[in-house]
């Protein structure tokens, strides 16, 4: 038997907590036997004194075990259970292609995703743009679609990781969100509750990233890779670029359209293709579905080219309540905004840099994102045909196309887009889409 205040005192004094102490405290978060004040105090103690790797693993696994841990054995799946998670960005539509692509290569992808908050878009919000799609299906339907289709992308259910929900809301209100240890446990407890065989982690870097610097992003990536592998899930973290919009669009319905165009081959943005392939290939390697990266990429290109990945996306949508002909006739089902109009550059030159966070906030201003949890979204609005860094532009070249519901909203977004995309006299140096892979062997 432990006392919550003694656990707080120990961490306040910079000492390491035992796994038993951490389990006791997390159980108290779940059962409400630990007060909000005590949770806030421990969060602040961890923020200032940090946790070693053993503590991080203990916190992550205790939070994972605070609720239901999914069990796939009873389904008799004939392939590995694999997934990816992103720290969030702008125009990050990867999950919509990656899930069906990995499933088409023999994996099973039970992806539990979140909604957008702040400048980053949420995967669930994109699916909410699809008429009829159930982002909160019953456990039975979720398992049925995973088994029969190979992929199901849904929202977090109430019985998964209840400790994280309470801990996170208190961290958000007490300025301890930025702790690497607590971020690691929050992200991984949700993913590990899905009982994965392997995980690819996408940690964003740059002006649209969650972490403020490359160094902070790398520290988070290393922490996640070390803790996940330490907890028994094969994991690789990728550091990927978010100094510009990842797809050529940002929003909800507009990103669904780009995902379908990617899967069918109608249009594949080169940067989006590179990051999607990098993450998906890593999932196949970790899951034992490919012998090396070249083999993984060949398999992924095959399921794109033969239409199998697009077919599975369609089956997932219809299996979760959406239209059966969604892939073939998506324009019939996706909402469209009243005003669709380009924004032009004020001067001749090159797209030199981008404040990606501000572009994400422009989508929020249009109504496509949340200022606070619970806000209602307009799924039709957003940006399309966003220029890429290095593109040559002039006063007749659109740097983006705005999808808005009113002239006032368009005007506000136009100002934001012009301010966020900086035009220079020369083209910037090209940066890689993927900066680094952090594998278990690198830790």
From Swiss-Prot:
Catalytic activity reported: thymidine + phosphate = 2-deoxy-alpha-D-ribose 1-phosphate + thymine
Keywords of this entry: Glycosyltransferase, Transferase
Enzyme Commission code: 2.4.2.4
Recorded GO MF terms: 1,4-alpha-oligoglucan phosphorylase activity; thymidine phosphorylase activity
GO biological process: pyrimidine nucleobase metabolic process; thymidine metabolic process
UniProt keyword annotation of Transferase present: yes
SMART domains tied to this protein: PYNP_C (SM00941)
InterPro entries: Glycosyl_Trfase_fam3 (IPR000312), Glycosyl_Trfase_fam3_N_dom (IPR017459), Glycosyl_Trfase_fam3_N_dom_sf (IPR036320), Nuc_phospho_transferase (IPR035902), PYNP-like_C_sf (IPR036566), PYNP_C (IPR013102), Pyrmidine_PPas_bac/euk (IPR018090), Pyrmidine_PPase_CS (IPR017872)
GO annotation, cellular component aspect: cytosol
Pathway given in the UniProt record: Pyrimidine metabolism; dTMP biosynthesis via salvage pathway; dTMP from thymine: step 1/2
SUPFAM superfamilies registered for this protein in UniProt: Nucleoside phosphorylase/phosphoribosyltransferase catalytic domain, Nucleoside phosphorylase/phosphoribosyltransferase N-terminal domain, Pyrimidine nucleoside phosphorylase C-terminal domain
PANTHER family: THYMIDINE PHOSPHORYLASE
Chain's role: The enzymes which catalyze the reversible phosphorolysis of pyrimidine nucleosides are involved in the degradation of these compounds and in their utilization as carbon and energy sources, or in the rescue of pyrimidine bases for nucleotide synthesis.
Subunit relationships: Homodimer.
Family: Belongs to the thymidine/pyrimidine-nucleoside phosphorylase family.
Protein name per Swiss-Prot or TrEMBL: Thymidine phosphorylase
UniProt source species: Shewanella baltica (strain OS195)
Organism placement in taxonomy: Bacteria, Pseudomonadati, Pseudomonadota, Gammaproteobacteria, Alteromonadales
């Amino acid at each position: 038997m432990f006392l919550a205040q003694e656990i707080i005192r120990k961490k306040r004094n910079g000492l390491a907590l035992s796994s038993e102490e951490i389990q006791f405290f997390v159980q108290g978060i779940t059962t409400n036997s630990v007060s909000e004040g005590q949770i806030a105090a421990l969060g602040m103690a961890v923020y200032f004194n940090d946790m070693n790797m053993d503590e991080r693993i203990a916190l992550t696994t205790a939070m994972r075990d605070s609720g239901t841990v999914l069990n796939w054995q009873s389904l008799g799946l004939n392939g590995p259970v694999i997934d990816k998670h992103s720290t969030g960005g702008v125009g990050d539509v990867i999950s919509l292609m990656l899930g069906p692509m990995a499933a088409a290569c023999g994996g099973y992808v039970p992806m539990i995703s979140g909604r957008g908050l702040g400048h980053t878009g949420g995967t669930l919000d994109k699916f909410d743009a699809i008429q009829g799609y159930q982002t909160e299906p019953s456990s039975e339907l979720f398992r049925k679609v995973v088994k029969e289709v190979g992929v199901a992308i849904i929202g977090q259910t109430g019985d998964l990781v209840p400790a994280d929900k309470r801990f996170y809301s208190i961290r958000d209100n007490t300025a301890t969100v930025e702790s690497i240890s607590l971020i690691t446990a929050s992200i991984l407890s949700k993913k590990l509750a899905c009982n994965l065989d392997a995980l690819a982690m996408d940690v964003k870097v740059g002006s649209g990233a969650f972490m403020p610097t490359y160094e902070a992003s790398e520290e988070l990536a290393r922490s996640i890779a070390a803790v996940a592998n330490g907890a028994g899930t094969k994991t690789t973290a990728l550091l990927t670029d978010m100094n510009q919009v990842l797809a050529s669009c940002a929003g909800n319905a507009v990103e669904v359209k780009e995902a379908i165009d990617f899967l069918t081959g109608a249009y594949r943005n080169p940067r989006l293709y590179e990051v999607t392939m990098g993450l998906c290939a890593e999932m196949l390697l970790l899951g034992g579905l490919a012998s090396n990266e070249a083999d993984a990429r060949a398999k992924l290109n095959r399921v794109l080219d033969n239409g199998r990945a697009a077919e599975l996306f369609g089956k997932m949508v219809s299996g979760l309540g959406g239209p059966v002909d969604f892939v073939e006739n998506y324009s019939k089902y996706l909402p469209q905004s009243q005003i669709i109009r380009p924004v032009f550059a004020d001067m001749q030159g090159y797209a030199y840099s981008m404040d990606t966070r501000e572009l994400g906030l422009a989508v929020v201003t249009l109504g496509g994102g949340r200022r606070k949890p619970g806000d209602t979204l307009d799924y039709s609005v957003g940006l399309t045909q966003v220029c890429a860094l290095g593109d040559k532009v002039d006063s007749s070249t659109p740097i983006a196309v705005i999808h808005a519901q009113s002239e006032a909203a368009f005007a506000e977004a136009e100002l934001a887009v012009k301010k966020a995309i900086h035009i220079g006299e020369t083209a910037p140096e090209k940066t890689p889409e993927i900066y680094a892979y952090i594998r278990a062997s690198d830790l």
